[in-house]
Amino acid sequence: MATATKTNDVVLEINNISVSFDGFYALTEVRTKVMRNSIHFFIGPNGAGKTTLLDIICAKTKPTSGTVIFHPKGREAVRLTGMKEYKIVREGVGRKFQVPSVFVNLTVEENMILSLKGHKGILDSIFKKPSKEDMESIRSTLERVGLEDKASERAGSLAHGQKQWLEIAMQLVQKPEIIMLDEPAAG
């Protein structure tokens, strides 16, 4: 027997998303709901539109039609479609890209500090000192992903898989309500 989905259990709604690139439809009327505290996978061959869907959710690509609705816990639903990328991140939607995006000339810890949620601008990132709570969160997150002994090393010296874990840690320390991983085991 099927049970009805409670709206407060849904964290992300994808409603009839289509995207066309010069007449070629990469996605056609994709619909799904992502439940809070769950793991979902989009599986398909190369070119199936998995990354394109994540790009639409994060506003990297504009859909031809459809909407993406985010349901943050304890707040009103937010229409992500049409928002700017940085505003989506501030709402609590995290994304780890297929190719690691870390600052290779900074240490692992410095990368983590830059990704802290409270550091919202260039000047904050340069001049604002992280709190003791921030540093504890960084330490525990690095421990969680197995990089605690690499905190003072330059990110560029890490192996590819360690860079993947660093980028995941950079998302986790922001405490997003949802995190999307694009090919996290690639490479």
Whereabouts are the PLM-identified features?
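Conserved catalytic motifs of ABC-family nucleotide-binding domains
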Residues: 175
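Conserved ABC nucleotide-binding domain
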Residues: 81-82, 141-159
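The feature captures the beta-strand-to-loop junction immediately N-terminal to the Walker
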Residues: 43-45
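ABC ATPase NBD Q-loop/coupling interface
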Residues: 67-90, 130
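Helix-to-loop junction immediately C-terminal to a conserved catalytic motif
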Residues: 58
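Hydrophobic anchor residue at the start of the ABC signature
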Residues: 168
